């Protein structure tokens, strides 16, 4: 019997001077970047959590600790590729992804197609099965004041063969 599972991921990072802004593996020209142990790619971190959660494999912190020097300043696309391998090892493939980025600035719309292309490549899936939306916080809260950026991701995974997937 085919198994399907859903996953949900959330991440938030503070904006800080002196950092590159990388979201969805795309470097976005901006005066600030996201603060974190890795490249702080808020979208890809939420994606990793959604995929790991769907497969009952824990979360990003379990697999890629922010105290582990191996992950200092790592390109989060490498983390997505590692999560993809973990899913494959348990018999799952990604069916679709729906994501929302919440940022007061900069505008994300010009960069969304690049984000989708990166995720499709890293997860070996059709770009047409990935949707990314961008919203503002309507100037409310820390995100609305431009202090940080949030990403939320939901995903659907299914076992890729006729047998039972082993979580």
From Swiss-Prot:
Binds 1 divalent metal cation per subunit. Pfam families: YgbB. Keywords: Isoprene biosynthesis, Lyase, Metal-binding. InterPro entries: MECDP_synthase, MECDP_synthase_CS, MECDP_synthase_sf. It catalyses: 4-CDP-2-C-methyl-D-erythritol 2-phosphate = 2-C-methyl-D-erythritol 2,4-cyclic diphosphate + CMP. Disulfide bonds: none annotated. Involved in the biosynthesis of isopentenyl diphosphate (IPP) and dimethylallyl diphosphate (DMAPP), two major building blocks of isoprenoid compounds. Catalyzes the conversion of 4-diphosphocytidyl-2-C-methyl-D-erythritol 2-phosphate (CDP-ME2P) to 2-C-methyl-D-erythritol 2,4-cyclodiphosphate (ME-CPP) with a corresponding release of cytidine 5-monophosphate (CMP). This is 2-C-methyl-D-erythritol 2,4-cyclodiphosphate synthase. The lineage of its organism: Bacteria, Pseudomonadati, Pseudomonadota, Betaproteobacteria, Nitrosomonadales. The gene is ispF.
